[in-house]
A protein has these predicted regions:
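Vicinal oxygen chelate
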Residues: 53, 122-123, 226-228
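Glycine-rich, proline-tolerant flexible connector loops at the mouths of alpha/beta enzymes
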Residues: 42-70
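Histidine-acidic metal/acid-base catalytic patches
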Residues: 1-39, 74, 100-103, 167-189, ...
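Active-site acidic/histidine proton-transfer and metal-coordination neighborhood
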Residues: 66-67, 71-82, 88-187, 196, ...
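Active-site-proximal loop/turn and secondary-structure-junction residues that shape catalytic pockets
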Residues: 12-14, 45-47, 86-89, 121-126, ...
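The substrate-binding groove and active-site-proximal loops of carbohydrate-active enzymes
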Residues: 56-59, 86-95, 192, 230-232
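Short, conserved active-site loops that position catalytic residues or coordinate cofactors/metal ions
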Residues: 36, 41-50, 82-85
Length: 288
């Protein structure tokens, strides 16, 4: 039986109206992901959801309630793969609102044994104090992860690649990933963000393989300000990346998200198509 599972990330739906299109509709996302053949889902805990976007609390809304979340997952035979906690974390210590979001996430995850606490940096600009702020990110991620580990959770840090992201290039990775405390957090390589940051995916995986405990898949076109393509149509060799995981006896989730333009208009359809693509192309590699 395969030790690798395939899940879906809610960001595919978040893009429509910057959260407004599918606000408080996590049950719908769970349903579609299940229909696509995914067995898990990874929602976000977006700290700025209410204050900056005018959406529901943490972009979970009613599903901040662990009972409501569990009921929706159970109705579709789905697992909570993890929660992606999104904060800036570039101050000297966690801001009060960031700490509140982190503590909420830790408390919610206590109801879902085995689900990952993902820490994701909210892009906050690269124009000033870059080195200090990168180190702040590592310090704050370590602090969150230490509290979560003390609560019995497993954690993983997820960098990204928008132009304003603090952790997007080889130099950024060298600073931040080497400053993570491996006793409390691993690393989630997002292969699309790695290539967008100008790095080779396999070389980067090799360099930091001791930290890999979660992974995100999305495809990359290299064209335009949002250089994404639907899974299987871009420049990434997902077969090779998946073989890399199998060869290293990776156990855990492959979380698929799609940021291609077509996904903005039709996140359901793209998720269904990507589920089929994974089943046909990647499931055989992992033994599903």
């Amino acid at each position: 039986m395969s030790k690798i599972k395939f899940g879906s990330q809610v960001y595919t739906w978040f893009m429509q109206g910057t959260g407004k299109g599918y606000d408080n509709k996590l049950d719908h996302m769970i349903k579609v992901a299940a229909e696509a053949g995914f067995t898990g889902i990874e929602p976000m805990v977006l700290e700025i959801s209410e204050s900056a976007l005018g959406c529901g609390k943490y972009w979970l809304g009613d599903f901040c309630d662990p009972i409501k979340l569990k009921d929706s997952l159970d109705a579709h035979n789905m697992t909570l793969a993890g929660l992606a906690l999104v904060c800036a974390w570039d101050g000297e210590e966690e801001a009060p609102n960031e700490r509140a979001a982190a503590d909420f996430t830790i408390d919610l995850l206590k109801h879902f044994p085995g689900a990952m606490l993902g820490t994701v940096t909210l892009p906050s600009g690269r124009t000033s104090d870059l080195q200090r702020r990168r180190l702040n990110v590592a310090r704050n991620v370590n602090a969150v992860s230490r509290r979560a580990t003390d609560a019995g959770l497993v954690c993983s840090y997820h960098p990204n690649s928008p132009p304003a992201s603090l952790v997007r290039t080889q130099e950024d990775y060298d600073v931040v990933l080497s400053s993570l405390d491996p006793s409390v957090t691993g690393w989630t390589p997002d292969v699309g963000h790695i290539i967008r940051g100008g790095m080779d995916v396999i070389a980067t995986l090799n360099k930091w393989q001791h930290l890999v405990n979660h992974i995100h898949y999305k495809d990359y076109s290299g064209n335009g300000p949002e250089p994404w393509s639907q899974m299987g149509t871009g420049k990434l060799d997902f077969h090779k990346i998946t073989e890399w995981l199998v060869q290293r006896n990776y156990e855990g989730w492959i979380i698929c998200e799609d940021e291609a333009h077509v996904a903005v208009d039709d996140p359901d359809g793209v998720t269904l198509q990507n589920g089929i693509w994974c089943k046909e192309n990647l499931h055989p590699i992992v033994g599903l």
